[in-house]
């Protein structure tokens, strides 16, 4: 017997029709904050398959052909048809929830990038006073440290951050399910305005250095983790250019304490005075 569950991320509801009873409760528990009663845009059929085991490591990853995306990992094999908004995934129960998370994360990434003109950033998103501050950098740059040094703030994610245009002159950051990253605090399943962005630089001093547009693009630009034949490099650059033209971006030198928030608050006040 199949059971249907609809979840919504970044304003996109999808239904998951899960075959059998064994994994219905853990899936509902994992995605409960993102449950939705809206009509789904995508329909995904999910089948446990005890015999599934990907032996050929060269087949692992994402491929795109004729409007269909195939996603293969150690314990899953799935596809998305972007022409009729349907998908199918088979998962070995030995790694069910984690494998489903891999597929769903990639699915929403594709939707955000291909349908919303959005971007997916390797960053930590911190919600403070109903506005989001995004801190970027490679592994080891201090993203998790920033989250730990912000105990009174809500951490939307410290790994994958969904950003998309909101109106004509602003951007919104959306919460995502817990896909193996650190999250903290209660938040609503909606977009929050993106206030500032920071590229992290560990230092004994604490200060902000504003980026110009060209330098900012070169510092924060990353190629999205999707098949490149679905999106041109020119289009990706255009999206970063638009984002950084609207959202202030800085190199943030910080020590292992919370003083960087004082520097951010001073910069906020300075920007408010200029705008006023």
Go through the PLM ranges and name each one.
Residues 141-143:
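Conserved glycine(s) of the Walker
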Residues 146:
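Hydrophobic positions on the alpha1 helix immediately C-terminal to the Walker A/P-loop
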Residues 1-138, 149-156, 161-276:
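A noncatalytic interaction/capping subdomain that flanks phosphate/NTP-handling catalytic cores
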């Amino acid at each position: 017997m199949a059971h249907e569950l609809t979840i919504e991320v970044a304003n996109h509801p999808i239904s998951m029709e899960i075959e059998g009873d064994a994994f219905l409760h853990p899936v509902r528990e994992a995605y409960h904050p993102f449950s939705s009663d809206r009509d789904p845009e995508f329909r995904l059929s999910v089948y446990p398959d005890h015999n599934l085991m990907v032996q050929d490591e060269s087949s692992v990853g994402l491929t795109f052909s004729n409007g269909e995306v195939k996603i293969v990992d150690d314990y899953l094999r799935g596809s998305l048809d972007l022409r009729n908004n349907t998908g199918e995934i088979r998962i070995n129960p030995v790694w069910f929830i984690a494998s489903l998370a891999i597929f769903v994360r990639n699915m929403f990434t594709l939707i955000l990038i291909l349908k919303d003109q959005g971007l997916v950033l390797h960053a930590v998103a911190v919600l403070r006073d109903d506005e989001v501050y995004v801190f970027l950098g490679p592994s080891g740059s201090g993203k998790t440290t920033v989250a730990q040094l912000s105990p009174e703030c809500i951490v939307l994610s410290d790994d994958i951050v969904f950003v998309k245009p909101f109106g004509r002159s602003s951007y919104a950051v959306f919460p995502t399910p817990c896909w193996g990253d650190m999250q903290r605090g209660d938040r609503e399943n909606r977009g929050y305005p993106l206030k500032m962005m920071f590229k992290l630089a560990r230092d004994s001093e604490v200060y902000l250095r504003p980026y110009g547009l060209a330098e900012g693009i070169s510092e924060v630009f990353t190629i999205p983790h999707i098949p490149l034949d679905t999106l041109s490099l020119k289009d990706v650059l255009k999206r970063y250019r638009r984002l950084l033209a609207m959202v202030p971006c800085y190199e943030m030198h910080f020590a292992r304490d919370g003083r960087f928030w004082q520097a951010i608050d001073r910069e906020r006040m300075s920007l408010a005075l200029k705008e006023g």
